[in-house]
């Protein structure tokens, strides 16, 4: 890997389109265009894929036929953000899971592979199926690769300790950065766990949240 000095990254949080907060996403796009980052990394869950969820099985939501429109919205937003890299995630895994459980004979179709389904190559986006080392010692992950903590930053830090490298992730919908340092004979090493938060509209769109309440952190 070639490391360039002063390389700047934007980490975009869980959007979960169409449950995203339009104004917050608009502000993120404006900031991305103004700052002209070298790379724009997305931690996954760019789509909520609500109708593919096991929680709506047998309900009218499963038959809503909204996925095409949701995909188009996501493609537009990701393009406007200047997204360069996206990691796999549990919500976008729902496409594969739906096919596996309901129509396994379609699994061989290349157009139903998620990154092709989203036309990411046409958008100039690299899709990563495994944790991606975007800078030496720093990995982009979704956050569901380990055990989730209720404390911001700790899910990422636990992954960092497990992998021996700093980790930036989403999934928890919390924002936080925490570090772990080891040392011996005056030689120290530090790894970071960073969680990116979310940009969902909890009040108006996340109807599954009772009283629109959750210990999450909206922002970027």
Predicted regions span which residues?
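Alpha-helix C-terminal capping segments
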Residues: 77-82, 134, 158-162
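Beta-strand-turn-beta hairpins that frame and shape the catalytic cleft
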Residues: 1-10, 132-139
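Active-site neighborhood of phospho(di)ester-bond hydrolases with catalytic His/Asp-centered motifs
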Residues: 11-13, 39-45, 85-90, 140-143, ...
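Conserved beta-sheet core of the metallophosphoesterase superfamily
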Residues: 143-220
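Core catalytic region of metal-dependent phosphoesterases/phosphodiesterases
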Residues: 8, 12-121
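Short, well-ordered loop/turn elements at secondary-structure boundaries
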Residues: 5, 36, 134-135, 161-164
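A generic local structural motif
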Residues: 26-29, 72, 76, 126-132, ...
């Amino acid at each position: 890997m070639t490391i360039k000095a002063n390389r700047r990254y934007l980490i975009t949080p869980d959007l979960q389109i169409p449950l995203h907060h339009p104004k917050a996403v608009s502000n993120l796009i404006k900031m991305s265009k103004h700052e002209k980052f070298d790379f724009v990394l997305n931690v996954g869950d760019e789509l909520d894929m609500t109708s593919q969820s096991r929680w709506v099985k047998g309900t009218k939501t499963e038959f809503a036929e909204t996925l095409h429109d949701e995909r188009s919205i996501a493609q537009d937003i990701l393009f406007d953000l200047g997204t360069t890299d996206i990691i796999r995630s549990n919500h976008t895994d729902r496409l594969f899971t739906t096919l596996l459980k309901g129509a396994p004979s379609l699994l061989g179709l290349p157009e139903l592979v998620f990154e092709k389904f989203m036309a990411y190559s046409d958008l100039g986006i690299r899709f990563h199926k495994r944790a991606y080392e975007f800078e030496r010692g720093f990995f982009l992950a979704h956050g569901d690769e380990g055990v989730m903590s209720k404390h911001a930053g700790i899910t990422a830090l636990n992954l960092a300790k497990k992998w021996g490298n700093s980790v930036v992730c989403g999934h928890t919908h919390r924002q936080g950065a925490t570090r772990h340092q080891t040392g011996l004979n005056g030689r120290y090493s530090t790894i970071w766990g960073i969680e990116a938060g979310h940009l969902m509209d909890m009040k108006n769109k996340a109807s599954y949240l009772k009283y629109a309440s959750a210990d999450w952190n909206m922002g970027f």
